[in-house]
């Protein structure tokens, strides 16, 4: 509130969903929930702590609830592509977008010195298929992306990057126009918010 910047929170799901209301009232603009894998096998094998203490369903409950409170496109579900079969990743995309959230897809990269250092990197063709599927579902379900200004990350492929894979048809054109209209509509809000933050910071400095 003092800076005017947008606030995004990456959280583990909780049983008491009303706790998210408190965060929204405090000024949270975005929620992100990382459940990583769709298949029970991969989720249990690679995320044993989450599987044991939380379970997958808790992540979807949290996404559905917070998306219902904030609106479409302001909640994300994070998944890792390239470890489990892409059919499972596509199921995850369906579940996330059914919640009104957008998928944040991290492509698996084997890191030297890690437990999965020798695990093979995913094929480009399969990852392209995954991102094409993601943008198709976002277009189909009219989940807006890229509305907030100046959001740049290097670790993941942003949903907006997948627009290059979308079909050049009327649905895509309408979706692009929809996102553009929303961006224009909320731009004054973001500008006012940042200006208020600038004034507060100047007052504190003086």
For the regions a protein language model found, what residue spans apply to each?
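Conserved AdoMet/S-adenosylmethionine-binding subsite of the radical SAM
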Residues: 1-119, 126
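Auxiliary Fe-S-binding modules of radical SAM enzymes
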Residues: 69, 86-206
